[in-house]
A protein has these predicted regions:
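Active-site neighborhoods and metal-handling regions in enzymes and metal-associated proteins
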Residues: 1-178
Length: 178
């Protein structure tokens, strides 16, 4: 593993770096799954959010907002863009949907031999994204006491765009509740 995985359900999912609790999964919970490994010495990082049974309508709405924010950022990502400008693509969309204050972290980070490397893709930085770098695109919305949603993929930055290194589905998967 390239880092300790995060498996955070229900209200614990509203904590971006949640730690395990003894709270059992409940029908309607969203579960944030953040995990990664190493391949040939290089780290990986991916996050998906799944539902246990049928989530509340607000959770489905937030999921689709995060998914669209990520889609827009993936489309805009390319070498030569600044980290702040790329972060702004997702952050602006989330803000327009009324959840700006609930997107509390930067959009992503570099990944290489270590899980968190330069550049930091954030509203706090103004670095130019270099060709050949691998960065994460991971917008999230976190509603304290309720749930969180984060969707993360790694991309290879190129002068004319970004190549997604993930092929897994981003559809909201509903796992049957026990």
């Amino acid at each position: 593993m390239s880092f300790d995985p995060i498996v955070a359900s229900g209200p614990n999912g509203a904590l971006p770096h949640a730690r395990p609790t003894d709270r059992p999964l409940q029908a309607g919970d969203l579960v944030v799954l953040d995990f990664g490994g190493f391949v040939d010495g290089y780290a990986s990082d991916m996050t998906r959010t799944v539902a246990i049974g049928e989530p509340e309508p607000a959770a489905v709405e937030v999921y689709h907002i995060v998914l669209e924010a990520q889609r827009r950022a993936l489309e805009a990502a390319r070498a030569g863009l600044t980290t702040r400008a790329l972060d702004a693509v997702a952050r602006t969309y989330i803000g327009e949907q009324g959840y700006g204050a609930q997107f509390s972290h930067g959009l992503g980070h570099g990944v290489g031999l270590q899980i968190h490397e330069w550049p930091s893709v954030s509203f706090r930085t103004e670095d130019v994204l270099p060709a050949g770098a691998v960065v994460t695109i991971e917008p999230g919305i976190y509603l304290p006491g309720r749930f969180g949603v984060r969707i993360e993929d790694m991309v290879l930055l190129q002068p004319d765009g970004a190549l997604s290194l993930a092929t897994s589905s981003k559809a909201l998967i509903r796992v049957a509740a026990a």
